[in-house]
Amino acid sequence: MTVPKEMPEKWARAQAPPSWSRKKPSWGTEEERRARANDREYNEKFQYASNCIKTSKYNILTFLPVNLFEQFQEVANTYFLFLLILQLIPQISSLSWFTTIVPLVLVLTITAVKDATDDYFRHKSDNQVNNRQSQVLINGILQQEQWMNVCVGDIIKLENNQFVAADLLLLSSSEPHGLCYIETAELDGETNMKVRQAIPVTSELGDISKLAKFDGEVICEPPNNKLDKFSGTLYWKENKFPLSNQNMLLRGCVLRNTEWCFGLVIFAGPDTKLMQNSGRTKFKRTSIDRLMNTLVLWIFGFLVCMGVILAIGNAIWEHEVGMRFQVYLPWDEAVDSAFFSGFLSFWSYIIILNTVVPISLYVSVEVIRLGHSYFINWDKKMFCMKKRTPAEARTTTLNEELGQVEYIFSDKTGTLTQNIMVFNKCSINGHSYGDVFDVLGHKAELGERPEPVDFSFNPLADKKFLFWDPSLLEAVKIGDPHTHEFFRLLSLCHTVMSEEKNEGELYYKAQSPDEGALVTAARNFGFVFRSRTPKTITVHEMGTAITYQLLAILDFNNIRKRMSVIVRNPEGKIRLYCKGADTILLDRLHHSTQELLNTTMDHLNEYAGEGLRTLVLAYKDLDEEYYEEWAERRLQASLAQDSREDRLASIYEEVENNMMLLGATAIEDKLQQGVPETIALLTLANIKIWVLTGDKQETAVNIGYSCKMLTDDMTEVFIVTGHTVLEVREELRKAREKMMDSSRSVGNGFTYQDKLSSSKLTSVLEAVAGEYALVINGHSLAHALEADMELEFLETACACKAVICCRVTPLQKAQVVELVKKYKKAVTLAIGDGANDVSMIKTAHIGVGISGQEGIQAVLASDYSFSQFKFLQRLLLVHGRWSYLRMCKFLCYFFYKNFAFTMVHFWFGFFCGFSAQTVYDQYFITLYNIVYTSLPVLAMGVFDQDVPEQRSMEYPKLYEPGQLNLLFNKREFFICIAQGIYTSVLMFFIPYGVFADATRDDGTQLADYQSFAVTVATSLVIVVSVQIGLDTGYWTAINHFFIWGSLAVYFAILFAMHSNGLFDMFPNQFRFVGNAQNTLAQPTVWLTIVLTTVVCIMPVVAFRFLRLNLKPDLSDTVRYTQLVRKKQKAQHRCMRRVGRTGSRRSGYAFSHQEGFGELIMSGKNMRLSSLALSSFTTRSSSSWIESLRRKKSDSASSPSGGADKPLKG
């Protein structure tokens, strides 16, 4: 923040220096933000951005110019505009102008309508957000205003569960001391509630009349994208007060468990930190589009070459032969030489031969993409019945790109997980609870479990809580002391707040979902946390109210990884209760607990193996004298001016030792349904999945194991946590060394010390033996993304099977995606559900938003949306793969049929004096791509499939051809062109050879221009129809109708154009009456057509037959397998759920926030509001994933890792 030097210590508004009246910040770099409360006139001088957001690209005025500019970025559109201009020049126009202008206008119009429709829905979504209502204090009265009309300096009233409309300075709230609780999942992905507090001088401004008189001015930092930092000063009543991030409510947050609060708007609209992290809407193009632009340029070069050849031929012919015809065929007056005749002939042939890339290609592409989008929208298997939400293709231009994805970047919270924590299992005094066994002693699966435990004995039980093991409740009821102490610890050692609005209706306000789950479990098992004061905690233990004196809270932080409370019970006994990470607490236990420790560690291994989040519970008795002495030293440490945190940590370490082990808890962070199966399937499809989350490392790693991204079968999991550039570089170097040493050990024959180029190093790393994973923290990632280290990070990460980035900001998410796009040249997909994911969604080639959540920002920015992560496998492996396959087959066929059609003119030029005479009449040229051959190829492009959808999911390796660009690339393009040229040669020379000596039935000469044209045109239509029949892999009634219908339409139009009726109406246009009927009545003509068709098609049939038998690809094998299966009985395969076992690792994860204990002890948050507890659902099985993993590892050439694979830090 910049504060003018001349500002006095006692600030007064009248003394504001002239420099304050700055011009609009957007004219230059804004150095500081100034906002005065309740003074719109003053704030308007700075012309700050309004609170209106915009994700749309056009408006009414800009739509036409901007959209046309975008469309003419397509090389083909510019090419056709150029041809149209040429056709308007009479001297060189060999075809009517309407043959180009009609299709060009048609394709521009269709694309414009599609873009306008897409943008209309963006406008509609923007309006839904901008028109949300907010209560704004205007002229001393609270008025309902739309979000878009909120201005900087306005005072807004927020109520519970409302989204924050702009970046606000919290002034006051319904909670004591100006506290309020917010959920920031839309910003940083964390679901645990956070606390914000108004500064004391404004916390009492809860009355409208007081707020109306508030005229303080805030001077603070300019708009930026730093979510966790804010610095500013409030000047009011001749005093100044420092402001920090703890005083701010950011747009995208939700007010929770707070009845109301008031805030002063500091940043609005695009200046908010949320929008600063969102990035710009980019015009996305597919790799096929980019390739098409290149190919169109090549074709244009080929076209110029043909034009030059024919122009030179024209000049030579005119000079050598044409001079003889001058007597009765004189040149036009403007043509005075053979050279100039050749020059005009060049442009005429450019017009004639332009059909090698017809404009109808682009119309057809848009129609096909639209059809694919509708298939996605109509897919019932991607419809979520629970949320009544269908899948939606929000753009129609990226469908085939879905079949080429190599990297998926996924958010965690709300995307992979449900944000629901469930108390799943526990270990108490060496006994594990939570599993249910049948009469034979086998562990019961989820669907085989009996009714959940009945908690009806407890009137205060949470009815949503489910637990399946009745033996734990029996242990509580019989008064087992260890079990009672276990739940007593859970009911005392926490920072949860409680409220009871009605008798028996108890609500918990949990600062983290983990704590909410643990305290709720204790509540249902008879240890009900009822209330607290700054110095006491009241618990109902099996119906008896007991009040404990709260002596101290040893608060949680990410370094300690534990929290403790010290309480005195009614008998005067002092006891410390502690819960924390097993890696931390197990070293602080008394040696007498060793036997119990070994058993508990076995249980912890089991829980961690199931992907559960674990905590260890312990206690310690303290004598009065020791506690008093310790409390005095703690007080002195808390008052220290320097190294306060270090001194307190040392004091805490001292007391948290030699504790007695009670047991462990296992909480399930519930995954979205089908997440493990989806990740397994996508991994088998050679898609790498990176998780980018704002959550902490332990939580992210635990979810990695839960969803099977990380497994104990991995050779090693590298964890990068360096705080400096050197530390991060060293950790990345060691990771690469280990991977390369592993490859060397299996005979790759190189060492890390070998000097390798960057490209060679990358290829070596990607071929490493074994499976590795990389976990990197946000502060380390900031260094890894620096220009001089980003390649090292990328090489290391891409050599790993899984990558998890923790504590990352929205901007870092986008930077990671951009890094992969920049260097890997791979198709990327980003998927998320919150506003913190918008930036990476916009940056990736394809953005997917999870809909049905509270926030809609991710959906608004996305290209595709659906309600559950599991639908991603169907979007990619079915719709994406089919879209890519269909588009590739369509393009190959389209180029083939148009080269076969156009190149006939080239060969004809050598027999017509290079006069730019066409073989076909202009009506056939116009209708060939629009009527005669358009619908069959459209049907193939929309409906074709190589294997059914079930096989696409069953054989994910079918997805790999799209990733490798195997189905349409430069090689395939040249093959299609060669086939088209081959067909054109036969199409011209076989009829030419036959017609040279053929006669009609009456003995007259068969050869005339019109008969030859009809024969060639008919042969062409039949040959390309047979060819598309060969190319079609999935026949529908529509395919049959379009192919046979197109042939029928061709003959109908052909006979009509040569009929007496049209001649009578248009004698100058349709002069060749009866020519088609007479020509096609000749057996010689039909024999010629059949011969041409056979000679054109048989080599294709022979080649495909040989390839199918000698070198079939996977889709051929799958189709063959499918035929075999139809002849055999389908065998039912029973899949047994297999739990993950392996080496020891910590299952600890606890999403708690530091500083809450101090807040409780201060008594500032003792007045409570309600909390709606999360609903608990049963856990879904992910049994079959292990089989998929095993299947892949069996097929891999690298040997499996050893038994002990440590989690590397």
Curated annotation (Swiss-Prot):
Taxonomy, superkingdom: Eukaryota
Supply one GO CC term from the record. trans-Golgi network
Q: How does it sit in the membrane?
A: Multi-pass membrane protein
Q: Where is the composition biased (Basic and acidic residues)?
A: 1-12
Q: Which residues cross the membrane?
A: 65-86, 93-112, 296-317, 347-368, 890-910, 923-942, 973-994, 1009-1031, 1038-1058, 1079-1103
> Does the UniProt entry include the keyword Endoplasmic reticulum?
yes
Binding residues annotated for ATP, in chain numbering? 411-413, 515, 556, 579, 613, 693-695, 807, 813, 836-837
Q: Which CDD domains match?
A: P-type_ATPase_APLT_Dnf-like (cd02073)
Q: Which InterPro entries match?
A: ATPase_P-typ_cyto_dom_N, ATPase_P-typ_P_site, ATPase_P-typ_TM_dom_sf, ATPase_P-typ_transduc_dom_A_sf, HAD-like_sf, HAD_sf, P-type_ATPase_IV, P-type_ATPase_N
Enumerate the UniProt keywords alphabetically: ATP-binding, Cell membrane, Endoplasmic reticulum, Lipid transport, Magnesium, Membrane, Metal-binding, Nucleotide-binding, Phosphoprotein, Translocase, Transmembrane, Transmembrane helix, Transport
> Know the name of this protein?
Phospholipid-transporting ATPase ID
UniProt organism field: Homo sapiens (Human)
Instruction: Tell me the classification of the organism that encodes this protein.
Output: Eukaryota, Metazoa, Chordata, Craniata, Vertebrata
Q: Which gene encodes it?
A: ATP8B2
